[in-house]
Design a protein with these regions (language model features):
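Structural marker of alpha-solenoid helical repeat scaffolds
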Residues: 56, 90-91, 125, 159, ...
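Register position in tetratricopeptide repeats
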Residues: 39-40, 73-74, 108-109, 142-143, ...
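TPR alpha-solenoid repeat register
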Residues: 63, 98, 132, 166, ...
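Residue-level recognition of tetratricopeptide repeat
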Residues: 60, 94-95, 129, 163, ...
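Canonical positions in the second alpha-helix
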Residues: 52-53, 86-88, 121-122, 155-156, ...
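Canonical tetratricopeptide repeat
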Residues: 66, 73, 100-101, 135, ...
Length: 349
């Protein structure tokens, strides 16, 4: 944010001293040299010349502001804050770049109440400063003031609805205060304005799911999949919400479709195996675990062990042994598999 105001600062200082070149030529020269040092990254030397310029009658607002910027670049934030404060005082509180930058420094120092106060003063001077409202919202969130954060982000969104990131931020702010209806409304409005942003539909599904409205969540994911039918990540989200909605069989079909599109999606294979296991479709579970194992998943071994355990509960020792040896094929270094196999093969040892 400091960089955003650096150009404004330079034009302010240079314009001022051009106007008074004849009455304070030496101060103007010092400011020009200091600015050149600043642009060259020699911030300590720039500070020395800025102070000399001040002794020669340079404008104290410009000097304090430029010194503050130099301190900021060297990460001396307390010194930067003190000099921004001087620039504000010398300008009788009218130089908004100093206020915005001072607020930014307070944020870096984690002095959030001071940061919030500075942003409010700056935004009274520049009420259309979108980034200022966003940073104010972030500062409020750091203090736990969810309402303050929401109001600030609402201001930013009202000023610029073309930035899709504001839609997400405003929705999150509404969710934070429990206003899911408003969050959904903002997302729908954003999608209406930016129909190319399919991720809005996916995000809408996430919000509905957070609200435990699983049917609406699945509907939003499906709406996105109508446009991007091969989006395996959205398909995975759909399967997940279907399981939460106790629609495991539909979820298994979705997961199977994912694996047809992307056979090496091991998370989907494990998920399918687990859902099939929970619904007692053990053959389907075995197939899914083996697909995951073939593609290097370290988790599939636990699926095989669970299936073997179920087989032993049913007194099907041969089936348990087969499953454990199948697992050993993919995980030969797993000592627990070897131990379980020996236990079945040598029950009397």
């Amino acid at each position: 944010m400091i960089k955003r105001f650096l150009t404004l600062r330079a034009s302010f200082a240079i314009a001022f001293f051009t106007a008074f070149a004849f009455s304070a030529q030496s101060a103007a020269d010092l400011m020009d040299r200091a600015n050149a040092l600043y642009r060259g990254g020699k911030f300590k030397n720039a500070i020395i010349l800025y102070r000399k310029a001040a002794d020669r009658g340079a404008d104290p607002v410009a000097v304090s502001f430029n010194i503050a910027n130099s301190y900021y670049q060297t990460e001396k934030f307390p010194e930067a804050a003190a000099n921004y404060r001087k620039a504000v005082d010398y300008s009788n509180g009218t130089f908004s770049p100093a206020l915005f930058n001072m607020a930014s420094v307070y944020f870096r120092l984690k002095q959030y109440p001071e940061c919030i106060a500075a942003y409010h003063r700056a935004l009274k001077l520049e009420p259309d400063n979108v980034s200022g409202w966003l940073y104010l919202g972030e500062a409020y969130s750091k203090t736990g003031d969810k309402i303050g954060a929401l109001k600030a982000i609402e201001k930013a969104y009202a000023l610029d609805k073309s930035d899709i990131s504001f839609v997400y931020q405003l929705s999150e702010a509404n969710i934070a205060v429990g206003d899911f209806e408003r969050a959904v409304s903002v997302i729908r409005e954003g999608y209406s304005s930016h129909p190319e942003e399919i991720d809005f539909l996916v995000y809408l599904g996430d919000v509905y799911r957070l609200q435990k409205d699983y049917e609406q969540s699945a509907g939003s994911y499906r709406e996105a999949l109508n446009i991007r039918p091969d989006d395996v990540n959205t398909m995975y989200k759909l399967a997940d919400v279907l399981v939460e909605d106790k629609k495991q069989f539909v979820a298994m079909d979705v997961l199977a479709n994912i694996l047809q599109i992307q056979p090496n999606f091991t998370d989907a294979a494990i998920f399918l195996g687990n859902v099939a296991y929970d619904t007692r479709f053990f053959e389907r579970a075995e197939s899914a675990y083996e697909q995951a194992a073939k593609n290097g998943s370290p988790e599939a071994v636990f699926g095989f062990k669970n299936l073997a355990y179920e087989a032993r509960l049913q007194k099907r020792e041969d089936e348990a042994l087969r499953l454990l040896k199948l697992a050993q094929k993919y995980y030969p270094a797993d000592a627990t598999l070897e131990a379980e196999i020996l236990d079945i093969e040598n029950p009397d040892r």
